[in-house]
Amino acid sequence: MKFILATRKSPLALVQTEMVAARLRQKIPGAECDLLKVVTTGDRQAEWSLSKQGGKGLFTAELEQALLRGDAHVAVHSCKDLPGENTPGLIVAGYLPREDVRDVLVLREGVTEPRTIATSSPRRQLQIKQLFPGATFTEIRGNVDTRLRKIAGGLADATILAAAGMNRLGIREWPGVVFRPLKLQESVPAVGQGAIALQCRQETIPLLRDVFDAGTARSVDVERAIQAAVGGGCQIAFAAHVSGDTLHFFHERTGVRTLPLTGADFANPAEAAKRLLGELNFHA
């Protein structure tokens, strides 16, 4: 069978979609893949502040429309770009094996205590402020390599990037900057960070069952259930990450918290979200 994979055009998106294509060919005998390259609203509006615009669906809506029109079988997303709720008629069917989930502090060479940090993410801003209380923040947009060049060129003292994206692009070092991976307690990752999500119509799921990684789904399904229960988009400072049987939770109202998870939580993520938010005394 030939699969049409809808993807953004950025270098990272194309690398991730090629990973999905390779997985399909590996797991499904005779599978062929073509890429449908789509420009999203977030790609077109390169000067927008994502936090002020809300960020919800800015990098996913056009890919979803391609699925709904029948132009593609699968949309390939960075899971952290997806809203918490499913779009009617579509489902996040599964994930590829998860990459390194950590955030990475990118420091301009010679800087140890950054005064200006370029990040548009309220989640990252509020958490990194605990490490560098005197820092101020500025906006930054662009692909991974663009952001690295901007920091090396002096736009700001530092920025924060996802380790997963840099690893997939093969970036281990960059002239003029130094990489410092952040611990989970220093920067709780975004929901789904490090996971590549495969979204499709319901009838496509049986074709893909052998492709998905169960371990990644076990964690990300709980994270996304919490995201849906909390509500909001990129404009709020919120994070949830499942590591083993532990939930790492961050919200501007609670700070960083950790809670144990049970087998029942993984069996019913929606109920788990209610229980966990209740224990945190969090009310959306």
Feature map (PLM): residue ranges:
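Small-molecule-sensing regulatory modules
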Residues: 1-39, 45, 52, 125, ...
